[in-house]
From Swiss-Prot:
EC number: 2.8.4.4
Protein name, UniProt field: Ribosomal protein uS12 methylthiotransferase RimO
Occurrences of domain Radical SAM core (ranges): 134-371
Top-level division of the source organism's lineage: Bacteria
Family: Belongs to the methylthiotransferase family. RimO subfamily.
Coiled coil: none
Keyword entries, A-Z: 4Fe-4S, Cytoplasm, Iron, Iron-sulfur, Metal-binding, S-adenosyl-L-methionine, Transferase
Free-text function comment from the UniProt entry: Catalyzes the methylthiolation of an aspartic acid residue of ribosomal protein uS12.
Organism: Rhodopseudomonas palustris (strain HaA2)
Gene transcribed to yield this protein: rimO
A single MF term (Gene Ontology): metal ion binding
TRAM domain sequence ranges: 374-440
Cofactor binding summary note: Binds 2 [4Fe-4S] clusters. One cluster is coordinated with 3 cysteines and an exchangeable S-adenosyl-L-methionine.
Cofactor(s) essential for the protein: [4Fe-4S] cluster
Amino acid sequence: MQQAAAPKISFVSLGCPKALVDSERIITRLRAEGYELARQHDGADLVIVNTCGFLDSAKQESLAAIGEAMAANGKVIVTGCMGAEPEQIEAAYPGVLSITGPQQYESVLDAVHRAKPALHNPHLDLVPEQGIRLTPRHYAYLKISEGCNNRCSFCIIPKLRGDLASRSAADVLREAEKLVAAGVKELLVISQDTSAYGVDLKYAESPWKDRSVRAKFIDLARELGELGAWVRLHYVYPYPHVDEVIGLMTEGKVLPYLDIPFQHASPDVLKLMKRPAAQDKTLERIKRWRAQCPDLALRSTFIVGFPGETERDFEFLLDWLDEAEIDRLGAFKYEPVAGAPSNALEGQVPDEVKQERWNRLMARQQAISARRLKRKVGTRQQIIIDEIGPTVAKGRSKADAPEIDGSVYLTSRRPLRVGEIVTAKIDRADAYDLHGTVAGF
């Protein structure tokens, strides 16, 4: 008797790495129940769309993805941040099977079961212990908490994902250890507010191996640094205790890399954003960090054209960047977000001014990046290989996160492998990328 075909699901994952982790968890559960993944909507039994709802542009992308799934398949389950406020989805696509908010894994699975029940097959119920991942095998996102306790005026993340909810240190470390055992060479630590990790748990201890570990930013970073993989810290809010992690970087326990979303530099704009406004002290801290760890790379994001931002505020930001010398920068033109307090602020900046300031900011940052990368010419850097091409390999240095930062293009006399970490001599630099040769050959 022929075995019935396993039900197939097509999956669309939109938004940030935190949403990608949500997608991985849903897919892991589905694969454990015997569902298969389809590459095309029209060949699937149903489609799941994990949406982003942070900016209006992201909502439009999510709606477009839902529309494509409805047109190609017709059976669509919607989840993710945009699903936390379902009215817009319901109005545009009343025929979707289910709409849920972020992290509602059980609700998504219930909707799948109703639409297409699983076929139990013990030969299919095999899932790697570390779960299903959507990233390449050599790196993985490690989500340590959900939600956020901050109330920045431009942000609705707490409304979508709730207040801070940290995982226990032991739970995080168990997942990290499984990932490393499965061949992961780089752990990218993510959350909405990584440096606030454990505040909600009152830094409670949990048993890990022969000891107890506190649910605290520095303690978790120290333990992750013992697993033998690169550890990269993202979304680090600049609380004073962040200074402590620089020592782990100088010891080689975690990568000399900090992703800190400063958002602006002008004290007046930061006050309107409800962000820490002591950026003069931040410059002093950056200088101390780099004195302690000269290889430190800083990534940040900034918003231009925020309501109330004057030309003087913007010039202040440019001057601050020149002094801070941020290595990697992402910039956004301010967009009103439904439900954000910043919508009610006076002094809305015209779109053409936003665009002009964004252009100037990116030009300034390009010059800073080129200047800093030029200093690396002639040095030797450790590079993790991401892709192998016909003549060159593409990788990243310790200063580069996947997808968002620069690349290092390498030539080598010997074959290289994806995920391999090699030492390379840097031969030249351009504005955002490095070029070099694998050392020793």
